[in-house]
């Protein structure tokens, strides 16, 4: 005998459970997409629109033009930038 009792099952219980699980999954997906938009895409879109509206296109960074220091390692001399 079942100590917790049992209820008669309805034939639509499985379908209702599936619909409920699908609805919750869709809500979670919408929440994840909204969070991704707020965190990443919004910032990327504003950066891209600022670059295209000002006519500035991101290119390679110029090389550092700082003074160099002589580095001696195991008797070999090399020039190394102070930026590193």
UniProtKB/Swiss-Prot annotation:
<dbReference type="GO" id="GO:0033644">
    <property type="term" value="C:host cell membrane"/>
</dbReference>
<keyword id="KW-0472">Membrane</keyword>
<comment type="subunit">
    <text>Interacts with the capsid protein (CP). Part of a MP-CP-viral DNA complex.</text>
</comment>
<keyword id="KW-0812">Transmembrane</keyword>
<keyword id="KW-1043">Host membrane</keyword>
<keyword id="KW-0916">Viral movement protein</keyword>
<protein>
    <recommendedName>
        <fullName>Putative movement protein</fullName>
    </recommendedName>
</protein>
<comment type="function">
    <text>Involved in the viral transport within, and between cells.</text>
</comment>
<keyword id="KW-0813">Transport</keyword>
<dbReference type="GO" id="GO:0016020">
    <property type="term" value="C:membrane"/>
</dbReference>
<keyword id="KW-1133">Transmembrane helix</keyword>
<feature type="transmembrane region" description="Helical">
    <location>
        <begin position="15"/>
        <end position="35"/>
    </location>
</feature>
<dbReference type="GO" id="GO:0046740">
    <property type="term" value="P:transport of virus in host, cell to cell"/>
</dbReference>
């Amino acid at each position: 005998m079942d100590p917790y009792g049992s209820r008669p099952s309805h034939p639509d219980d499985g379908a209702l459970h599936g619909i409920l699980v699908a609805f919750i999954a869709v809500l979670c997906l919408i929440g994840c997409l909204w969070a991704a938009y707020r965190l990443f895409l919004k910032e990327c879109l504003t950066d891209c629109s600022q670059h295209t509206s000002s006519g500035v296109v991101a290119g390679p960074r110029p090389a550092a033009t700082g003074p160099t220091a002589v580095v001696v390692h195991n008797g070999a001399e090399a020039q190394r930038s102070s930026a590193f």
